[in-house]
């Protein structure tokens, strides 16, 4: 154990979505202190340019590191695709873990040979997803489906609304019609819609989320680097901060039954 072990693991996303990753990290590492930043003032990220995303991600990471983060999880597929390499260059002393859409397990587990990927427009425009597809999905038909509007609906907590269901049905039905038996969730917000997705796609469709693998990678790094918090029975604290409205964010966390001890206001400055 090092002196850094009590410092928090930091995570950030444009909003509530990255809390699905925090939930998995908490499950694997219940003794760790967690610090989560929701940049709701700039949500959604999915239509922003790569330059914008790199500047925003750098500011979010700097905020977490200034508050003692010993490791930072980029709990957002869009920001990971645009900014992960840049963050590692900017902050070489801090380990970063990013989101990679689980195309590899999807390609190995599909029975029909058709896989659908649900993601934001910016994630689909980036190189990361295409690199993963070309490397791991040879011989598999991968259909990329942009899902504008879903993040905004989730941020409103409108998971079961007619508008959300209409959007989701419009995005998923073409994948099913094309023969997809496996759906990759390429945005950390989308696991919050798994029950709704299951209602459309049916129980036989495999739905894959990257969060468990990311949590495993976080656990591996803190163990290998001697950063594991030395606790036996005490649970770590979970602090959440938002650049938006803290009261509204706290209510959303509660409605979605996500783990959090307290919610704070955050102010970050984006370098031009």
Curated annotation (Swiss-Prot):
GO biological-process terms attached to the record: cell wall organization; peptidoglycan biosynthetic process; regulation of cell shape
Active-site residues per Swiss-Prot or TrEMBL entry: 76 (proton donor/acceptor), 187 (proton donor/acceptor)
Q: Kindly state which reaction or reactions the protein catalyses.
A: L-glutamate = D-glutamate
Q: Known EC number(s)?
A: 5.1.1.3
Q: Which InterPro entries match?
A: Asp/Glu/hydantoin_racemase, Asp/Glu_race, Asp/Glu_racemase_AS_1, Asp/Glu_racemase_AS_2, Glu_race
Annotated substrate binding lies at 13-14, 45-46, 77-78, 188-189
HAMAP family documented for this protein: Glu_racemase (MF_00258)
Q: What is this protein called?
A: Glutamate racemase
Q: Which organism is it from?
A: Roseiflexus sp. (strain RS-1)
């Amino acid at each position: 154990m090092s002196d850094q072990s009590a410092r928090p693991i930091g995570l950030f996303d444009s909003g509530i979505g990255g809390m699905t990753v925090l939930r998995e990290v908490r499950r694997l590492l219940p003794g760790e202190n967690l610090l989560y930043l929701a940049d709701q003032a700039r949500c959604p990220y999915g239509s922003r340019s790569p330059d914008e995303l790199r500047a925003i991600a750098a500011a979010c990471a700097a905020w977490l590191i200034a508050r003692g983060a010993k490791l930072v999880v980029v709990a957002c597929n869009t920001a990971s695709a645009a900014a992960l390499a840049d963050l590692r260059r900017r902050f070489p002393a801090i380990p970063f873990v990013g989101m990679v859409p689980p195309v590899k397990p999807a390609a190995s587990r599909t029975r029909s040979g058709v896989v659908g990927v649900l993601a934001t427009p910016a994630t689909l425009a980036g190189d990361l997803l295409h690199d993963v597809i070309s490397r791991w999905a040879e011989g598999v038909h991968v259909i990329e489906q942009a899902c504008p509007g879903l993040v905004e609906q989730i941020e409103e907590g409108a998971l079961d609304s007619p508008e959300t269901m209409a959007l989701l049905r419009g995005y998923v039905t073409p994948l099913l019609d094309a023969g997809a038996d496996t759906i990759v969730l390429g945005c950390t917000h989308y696991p919050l819609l798994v029950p709704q997705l299951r209602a459309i796609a049916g129980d036989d469709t495999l739905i894959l989320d990257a969060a468990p693998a990311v949590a495993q990678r976080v656990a591996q790094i803190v163990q290998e680097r001697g950063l594991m918090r030395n606790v036996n029975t005490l649970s770590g604290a979970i602090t959440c901060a938002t650049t938006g409205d803290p009261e509204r964010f706290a209510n959303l966390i509660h409605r979605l039954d996500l783990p959090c001890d307290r919610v704070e206001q955050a102010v970050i400055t984006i370098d031009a």
